[in-house]
Amino acid sequence: MTKERTFIAIKPDGVQRGYVSEIIGRFEKKGFKLVGLKQLIPSKELAQNHYGVHRERPFFGDLVDFISSGPVVAMVWEGEGVILSARKLIGSTKPLEAEPGTIRGDLAIDIGRNIIHGSDGEDTAKFEIDLWFNEEELCEWETSDLKWRSEN
C-alpha cells in the first residue's frame, strides 16, 4: 500500500463532549501521522461546500447548521491505507449500527450527532483537505518510530 492522506473532523458534539484527545489517541495508537490540525467554527459557506454532495437531501440545512454551530477539530492524517483504516476506526454512519470498539460504536447513539467525519475515498480526501487546509498548514515530518510500525 502507498502512503496516503485523509481528512478527519471531530464535529461540534465530539468537541463539546470532550472526546478530542481520545479520538486523536486512537489514530496515533494505530500508527498514523498527524500532518494538519486546527480548531475552528466553520462558516456556513464552508459547511455547505463540505457537504455539497448532500445539497438536495432533506437533512442538508440541518447538517450545515449543526456543523457550523460550534468548534470543529479539523485534521489531516497520513499513513499506509489511512483512508480505509480511518473508516474502520470511525465505524458506521449510524452509531447504533456501529461495531463496539469503533469511535461511533463507543461514543455516539444518534446519526445526527455521530461525533466524527472521515473522508470516504481518495478523491474525497483530496477535495476535503484542500477545502479545509492551505498547503502551508500541513506539516511534512518523519516519525522517529516509523521502522517499528511498517516493514516498508
Swiss-Prot record:
Coiled-coil spans in chain: none
GO cellular component: cytoplasm
EC number(s) per entry: 2.7.4.6
Subcellular location as annotated: Cytoplasm
Matches recorded under PROSITE patterns: NDPK (PS00469), NDPK_LIKE (PS51374)
Reaction catalysed by this enzyme: a 2'-deoxyribonucleoside 5'-diphosphate + ATP = a 2'-deoxyribonucleoside 5'-triphosphate + ADP; a ribonucleoside 5'-diphosphate + ATP = a ribonucleoside 5'-triphosphate + ADP
Domain of life: Bacteria
Assembly, per entry: Homotetramer.
PANTHER family found in the cross-reference section: NUCLEOSIDE DIPHOSPHATE KINASE
Family label: Belongs to the NDK family.
Protein name: Nucleoside diphosphate kinase
Lineage: Bacteria, Bacillati, Cyanobacteriota, Cyanophyceae, Synechococcales
